[in-house]
Amino acid sequence: WIQISNESYLLADNGEKYPIRSGNGITLGEKFWMPDSGEASFSLIFPLLPPTVKVIDFIESDCEDCFKVWGIHLDGKLPELDLSDDVKKQKLNYDEPLPKAELKDGKSVITGRLLGYEKHYALPFSCRTCDLLTAKFEDTEIKVNEDGTFRTEIELCTPTTVSFSVGRDIYFDVFLVPGGELDMAVNLRELSRSESKLLKGKRAGGKKVYFSGTMAALNDEMITDDEHLMDVWGMVHWNMNDLYNMTAGQYKAYWLKKYEETKSAICSDKKRSQAYRNLLLAQNDLLCTLTLTRVSSNLAYAYVQCSGLPAREAYQKFKQPELSDDFYDYIRQLNILNSPVMLYTNGYADLVRGMGYMRVKMDDKLSDIFAFILSSDKVSVEDAEIIREFKADTDAGKTSVYREKMGELRIKYDDLFKEFSSMQQDYILKKIIAGYLGTEQGLFFDLQKMMKYAQKISDFTPLTIHDFEEIRKMSDPYYLSRLTRMNNRLLETIEANKKKKGYTVNESGEVKDEDLFYSITSKFKGKVILVDFWATWCGPCKMAMKQMKPMKKD
């Protein structure tokens, strides 16, 4: 369904707003259910515009997420793109090779302009990178000046691909280099046209982005490539019926065939530069490995989509696929985990982290977390009995009366759960991955080690002298440099937090876990209060923090 807000209006180039009056074929403010064809037509009625008005914007209310169409020219003619002569006349060097794939600190300076931008557009513009040590995707918001110009600096640790987003749903990838400078003239209307189902068939109005500077030719190839070979790995493009009820072996064969077909298409197309082909090959390697590693979750998703059952019931009925002993031999076959070339891709760190959680057959002592917890002398007799009862209920397929209590024990014995998880990861790395690669050395294993220290810092735990002694043993100085900076920032944050004022610590005293919330709020009985619970790793929590700032000021 769609819905047109009754607060919609037209903003004309004379500065006046013309509020919507009514809809013909649609009722304003109510859900309009789309037919199965996905196509429908209706009219929106606005006041008569003065004859002097040439350009309008359609604005569906003033909220950030509301739909907007900017720069509608009433005569149907678009003005010429305002490109500088330097951009028009420049000659790009498509023979330029990719820079060396290595760990190298530096900032990439990004400058440019959003073509056709008006100051009231207020389009969000950002750059997304994947941090190599935390494996977190981080967004850098880019300030756009009233004339559409912008400048930002992106911290990098290697030449790599990043993703830019402009507006609501428009994304494009860019290759950046530490120490490099890249200028981008972003053609807003062509980016919009190329994403529109209705306008895709119309003639392009120039390039989506015009590049000059570091690796400009490669970025030009990336932005003008309409074959989109990597779409084969995008879940939105998958035919889930192909995957529905597949065995793990069929799933593996299916994607390895796609991988070889894509690889062949990349290598055979000599129109692309060698640099671009090498980048595409690296992306193909990465995305195939990610897709194969996510066999269980992807087959579960296909089952939910195609089974015809309600989602919750489908997930409950889905049976985890049986993995053969040689299922993961694609690790040896593709042989990319240790390759520095993976640094070119925007997601290698995500792969490195995810490989530590593969579903594999464990040794007996690592196959039962309950047995591990119960074997610890840190667990009290009373808690051990609850854990046994919970396990018995779970094994019998029953909903345990101790489910809520088990959640509390999960938090209480968090260190034991983390220890067990760490032991499982070590088994996967040393027995499975190292077995297929024939080594425990290399970039992949270095990152696995260093990610543990980065996670410690992310958990607000400063590194110890012993930690730094271990980090200094690494052959690449990047790790010591980066983790030292991360640790210093954490120490500065901790000290700054100690000096903060303007808040009151609400002492709850010694209370049971289930009584904590009541203890916090009981002192304010009869008053309206805002209680903000959040977690640093939680995406929705982070979004809510921004939304709640005005409430906290009130």
Explain the meaning of each model-derived region:
Residues 49-67, 162-167:
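Short, surface-exposed ligand- or partner-binding patches at beta-edge/loop junctions that are enriched
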Residues 525, 533-550:
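Conserved redox-active cysteine motifs that mediate thiol-disulfide chemistry
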Residues 69-102, 485-507, 517:
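Pro/Ala/Gly-rich low-complexity, hydrophilic intrinsically disordered segments
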Residues 552-554:
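Thiol-based oxidoreductase modules, predominantly thioredoxin-like and allied folds used
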Residues 2-24, 64-73:
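Solvent-exposed beta-hairpin/edge-strand motifs
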Residues 195-526:
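Oxidative protein folding and maturation machinery
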